[in-house]
Amino acid sequence: MNISVENPVFVHEDSTTQKTGELRLDSDIPMSKISSDDEVFLAPEMNAFGRQFRDYTDTNSERQKSVEHFYATQHTNQTLDFVQKMRSEYGKLDKMVMNIWECCELSKEVVDESDPDLDEPQIQHLLQSAEAIRKDYPNEDWLHLTALIHDLGKVLTLPQFGGLPQWAVVGDTFPVGCAFDESNVHHKYFMENPDFNNPKYNTKAGIYSEGCGLENVLMSWGHDDYMYLVAKENGSTLPSPGLFIIRYHSFYPLHKAGAYTHLMNEEDKENLKWLHVFNKYDLYSKSKVHVNVEKVKPYYMSLIKKYFPENLRW
């Protein structure tokens, strides 16, 4: 199936806040195709805990202390060798056979301990982000489905999938095999990583070449890369931007800080535009207000049928 993805209209925005309450990003981002102000998704200024989104500086918060401990462990253990072993093991896709919606149901059991903005079950985050995008981009059904499934890889924490520790599943992602950019959250903990002082891996390009394309770069192992492998190897017909979003939505050093762009090729640059669109809804739709699962289920089931086989190997 060939999917035609229309490029969004772009405008330049700064880091101030619009009158609509939407947070502006420091880059050119696509605008939605909705004209009515009362229909668009408005990004809140505070998260569910009454703090700024992605605020990692509040050392008095118990949740923040837990998040920092998570990143200390993650940064220490996510080595090139570890990533290669995980990709080899989970790339077999021999853990389970089920459909996409069954995995959505499983995600009810998952809570992301690295997320400073939400402690709700993952199925609510998935539906909140998907429904927010659906309001603003009603004609991009592939984007709605991408939002629904982007975090399904977090089931790696469940016993059925080997019960991986949180540091091997969630959190911001980054390339391994090259220098750890300082834009990574809690960068100081990389000093405990065995790759940090390895001359093969601690240069800007490391084992890669500039412009090689992110497809050829090994990322820290987690739910992004796992769900990307599941979608790709099971023959999903999602367009390239959808697969790009799935694999790199946690790659905040790239799409927020602009790091690692020397590794990108032209296709990556085009797909990054859609990731910038997606990130607003992924980050700012997190809420304590739940989506009625049964009400929206038929719509998403129709998208699953359109873009995926009935049953997938996981």
UniProtKB/Swiss-Prot annotation:
It comes from the Eukaryota. Substrate binds at R54, D112, E113, S114, K154, G171, D172, H249, S250. Its cofactor is Fe cation. Expressed in flowers and siliques. Pfam families: MIOX. Fe cation 2 binds at D151, H223, H249. Its EC number is 1.13.99.1. GO terms for cellular component: cytoplasm. Binds 2 iron ions per subunit. Pathway: Polyol metabolism; myo-inositol degradation into D-glucuronate; D-glucuronate from myo-inositol: step 1/1. Coiled coil: none annotated. Fe cation 1 binds at H125, H150, D151, D282. GO terms for biological process: inositol catabolic process; L-ascorbic acid biosynthetic process. It catalyses: myo-inositol + O2 = D-glucuronate + H2O + H(+). GO terms for molecular function: inositol oxygenase activity; iron ion binding. It is found in: Cytoplasm. Its main location: cytoplasm. Belongs to the myo-inositol oxygenase family. Involved in the biosynthesis of UDP-glucuronic acid (UDP-GlcA), providing nucleotide sugars for cell-wall polymers. May be also involved in plant ascorbate biosynthesis. This is Inositol oxygenase 5. It comes from Arabidopsis thaliana.
